[in-house]
């Protein structure tokens, strides 16, 4: 099983842009040295707790500081970008990383980002994402076209575009060609329509964990959509995000986790989000408890939501998750702000990669 890292980034709102930039590069280096496969970076323009508006800058800066880890924006919010500009930037950046780049796409799920870009809400965004990506795919194909869609317009020049003199067109398509670049899509709710759309296009799925039943539905939805279009689904492509904290003992891990950026993120930011999207019922059901979501506290999180404990305990929790949900190919650790006390966090990441995942029984 591989491990990945999702740098949302869940930062304290008081952090400066420079602090977040430096912290992001350090995390990328730590994950690369620990043997993580992927490093994914969120994109938001208005969220103080998730404040990285341009993940491509971090990807470009981290490229020469790392050796093996792959990078992805997770995700570029396509309705907020010019598709022609973004297609060229993505292709060029993938060439810089020479195979260590993949692409995440999404419509955008936060109303404040939508308002910033002139939309009253997020309702129309999915249709715009579809149109944007279709135009980007045509640009990467490097065949002449000119198209004005409902929301965007784009084209690609051909030999007859400027007949009075010869123009050599730069090849800013993805490294190794479009077919070599993985595209990934995230899913949050049960039977996610986003993952159905991803499966129909042979894009990879990333499941935001909301309980074993939701996780299973994410894979099943994606796999059924893949098969409906003649593709073969593989569990090795299925990624699942989890909050993870590892220490010598269960007690020490829980103590460190609750005092860390993980605890702060949940206490001040993620509790309302999980309640808004009704994600707690599935997790409570997994725990076998009869409690109301309003009763969920930090101790419940440490025991039932986070993969928290000694290496052996976390290994067991991952194996139970795999057994109950059907399994996945990559565990993706969610990022949290540990700028003020990074060493316990770095230790946890390193132990996950070296002591836990290599020993997980895949069933």
From Swiss-Prot:
Q: Which GO terms describe its cellular component?
A: cytosol
Q: Which domain of life is it from?
A: Bacteria
pH-activity relationship: Optimum pH is 7.5.
Mention any Pfam family matching this sequence.
Bac_luciferase
Query: NAD as a keyword?
Result: no
Induction text: By both (-)-camphor and (+)-camphor enantiomers.
EC number, as in UniProt = 1.14.14.108
One GO term under biological process is: (+)-camphor catabolic process
- Which positions bind FMN? 74, 186-194
Coiled-coil-forming residues are none
Pathway noted in the entry? Terpene metabolism; (R)-camphor degradation
List the InterPro entries hit by this protein, alphabetically. Bact_Lucif_Oxidored, Luciferase-like_dom, Luciferase-like_sf
Q: What class of enzyme is it?
A: oxidoreductase
Keywords from UniProt, A to Z, are:
Flavoprotein, FMN, Monooxygenase, Oxidoreductase, Plasmid
Which GO molecular function terms does the record list?
A: 2,5-diketocamphane 1,2-monooxygenase
- Catalytic function, reaction form: (1R,4R)-bornane-2,5-dione + FMNH2 + O2 = (1R,4R)-5-oxo-1,2-campholide + FMN + H2O + H(+)
The yes or no answer to whether the keyword Flavoprotein is present is yes
Q: What is said about its interaction partners and assembly? A: Homodimer. Likely forms a loose transient complex with a P.putida flavin reductase that provides the required FMNH(2) to the enzyme.
Role summary: Involved in the degradation and assimilation of (+)-camphor, which allows P.putida strain NCIMB 10007 to grow on this enantiomer of camphor as the sole carbon source. Catalyzes the FMNH(2)-dependent lactonization of 2,5-diketocamphane via a Baeyer-Villiger oxidation to produce the unstable lactone 5-oxo-1,2-campholide with (R,R) configuration, that presumably undergoes spontaneous hydrolysis to form 2-oxo-Delta(3)-4,5,5-trimethylcyclopentenylacetate. Is also able to convert (+)-camphor and norcamphor to the corresponding lactone in vitro.
Under the heading PANTHER family, the entry gives: BLL0895 PROTEIN (PTHR30137:SF16), LUCIFERASE-LIKE MONOOXYGENASE (PTHR30137)
Belongs to which family? Answer: Belongs to the bacterial luciferase oxidoreductase family.
Protein known as: 2,5-diketocamphane 1,2-monooxygenase 1
């Amino acid at each position: 099983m591989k491990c990945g890292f999702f740098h949302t980034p869940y930062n304290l709102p008081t952090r400066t842009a420079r602090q977040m930039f430096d912290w992001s590069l350090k995390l990328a280096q730590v994950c690369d040295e620990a043997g993580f496969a992927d490093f994914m970076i969120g994109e938001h323009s208005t969220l103080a707790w998730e404040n990285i508006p341009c993940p491509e800058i971090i990807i470009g800066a981290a490229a020469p500081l790392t050796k093996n880890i792959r990078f992805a924006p997770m995700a570029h919010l396509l309705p907020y970008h010019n598709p022609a500009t973004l297609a060229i930037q993505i292709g060029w950046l993938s060439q810089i990383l020479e195979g260590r780049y993949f692409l995440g796409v999404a419509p955008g799920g936060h109303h404040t980002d939508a308002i910033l870009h002139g939309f009253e809400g997020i309702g129309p965004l999915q249709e715009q994402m579809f149109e944007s990506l279709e135009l980007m795919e045509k640009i990467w194909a490097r065949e002449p076209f000119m198209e004005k869609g409902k929301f965007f317009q784009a084209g690609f020049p051909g030999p007859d575009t400027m007949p009075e003199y010869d123009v050599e067109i730069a090849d800013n398509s993805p490294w190794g060609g479009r077919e070599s670049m993985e595209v990934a899509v995230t899913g949050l709710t049960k039977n996610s329509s986003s993952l159905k759309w991803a499966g129909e296009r042979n894009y990879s799925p990333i499941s935001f964990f909301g309980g074993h039943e939701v996780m299973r539905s994410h894979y099943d939805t994606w796999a059924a959509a893949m098969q409906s279009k003649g593709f073969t689904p593989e569990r090795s492509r299925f990624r699942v995000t989890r909050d993870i904290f590892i220490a010598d003992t269960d007690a020490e891990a829980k103590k460190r986790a609750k005092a860390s950026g993980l605890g702060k993120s949940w206490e001040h930011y993620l509790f309302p989000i999980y309640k808004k999207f009704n994600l707690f019922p599935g997790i409570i059901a997994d725990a076998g408890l009869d409690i109301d979501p309003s009763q969920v506290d930090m101790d419940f999180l440490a025991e039932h939501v986070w993969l928290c404990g000694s290496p052996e305990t976390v290994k067991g929790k991952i194996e139970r998750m795999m057994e109950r949900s059907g399994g996945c190919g990559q565990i993706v650790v969610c990022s949290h702000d540990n700028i003020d006390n990074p060493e316990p966090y770095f230790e946890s990441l390193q132990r996950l990669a070296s002591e836990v995942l290599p020993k997980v029984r895949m069933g």
